[in-house]
Amino acid sequence: AELGVFKGDTAWKLNALFPQQRLYLFDTFQGFDPRDIKEEKSKGCSFAREGEFSDTSEQAVLGRLPFPGQAVIRRGYFPDTAAGLEQERFCLVSLDADLYAPILSGLIFFYPRLVPGGMILLHDYNNERFRGARQAVEEFEKQYGRLCLVPLCDLHGSAVIVKPCD
């Protein structure tokens, strides 16, 4: 699954690497939601603007995928768009929503549904432009316990969260 699809770069890679797997793609496809911008500003996380990252569409993303029949677009506000997927299990989730509220919602929804050994690739964990990612992880850990998180040395300050095997 991917939360925060934008133009589909990561979706393309996931779809190409795992052609037999269903790929849920969660995005507003209209840029940042005003509710998230309001919370972002109140927490001092970033200077994100409403509509930023809106230069995309479902059709453009699906048109890039090598196996578009395996992709399921869930357009709208997350976590509302996850309704009906409560019984799903996930092996790999790309969490690239940039902002505090959707990242926290993504962790709350996806982490318990990860299979043992499953991973969340968290974009912007160490990114100074979008500090809400780290704040969301800290809030999640306060509520649900410590995560097995490994920071990566990449341009966007990503991290990998691994669900321990039982």
Locate the predicted segments by residue.
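S-adenosylmethionine/decaboxylated-SAM
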Residues: 1-166
